[in-house]
């Protein structure tokens, strides 16, 4: 069964909408195979987003991701990655379709509520970054 990683970012955790977001995943037929709340360290955030290290927004992204707790989850189901990306909506919440997570819960392109894997290969690597295999069931 296909798996993908979801991160509910600090802005959405602070708004106390974690349950509403997780409910969207389950209502769309995705199973939450693993989930945990944690505080990323600067080293964690830099390592996770290393692919963006040369980009001008990298420093701000890292600072944002360590600004409060996050909720990381492994979502599982048929076409899990594409389904999650559809549920999230466009990166910029102003461009996100009505009813998507970002349209409903995000404030800006930076504080955009959620992260989702953008390829199956990245999903595998991102899941392994946060979860041991025995934690996923």
Curated annotation (Swiss-Prot):
Gene3D superfamilies cross-referenced by the UniProt entry: Nucleoside diphosphate kinase-like domain
Keywords annotated in UniProt: ATP-binding, Cytoplasm, Kinase, Magnesium, Metal-binding, Nucleotide metabolism, Nucleotide-binding, Phosphoprotein, Transferase
EC number: 2.7.4.6
GO MF terms held by the record: ATP binding; metal ion binding; nucleoside diphosphate kinase activity
Pfam families assigned: NDK
Enzyme class: transferase
Reaction(s) catalysed by this chain's protein: a 2'-deoxyribonucleoside 5'-diphosphate + ATP = a 2'-deoxyribonucleoside 5'-triphosphate + ADP; a ribonucleoside 5'-diphosphate + ATP = a ribonucleoside 5'-triphosphate + ADP
PROSITE patterns (UniProt xref): NDPK, NDPK_LIKE
Catalytic-site annotation from UniProt: 115
Cofactor: Mg(2+)
SMART domains per UniProt: NDK
Primary localization class, coarse: cytoplasm
Compartment annotation: Cytoplasm
Keyword ATP-binding: yes
InterPro entries given in the database record: NDK-like_dom (IPR034907), NDK-like_dom_sf (IPR036850), Nucleoside_diP_kinase (IPR001564), Nucleoside_diP_kinase_AS (IPR023005)
A single cellular component GO annotation: cytoplasm
Residues bound to ATP: 9, 57, 85, 91, 102, 112
Any single biological process term in GO: UTP biosynthetic process
Signal peptide: none
Similarity comment: family membership: Belongs to the NDK family.
Function: Major role in the synthesis of nucleoside triphosphates other than ATP. The ATP gamma phosphate is transferred to the NDP beta phosphate via a ping-pong mechanism, using a phosphorylated active-site intermediate.
Subunit structure: Homotetramer.
HAMAP family documented for this protein: NDP_kinase
The name this protein goes by in its record: Nucleoside diphosphate kinase
Organism: Aliarcobacter butzleri (strain RM4018) (Arcobacter butzleri)
Source species taxonomy: Bacteria, Pseudomonadati, Campylobacterota, Epsilonproteobacteria, Campylobacterales
Gene: ndk
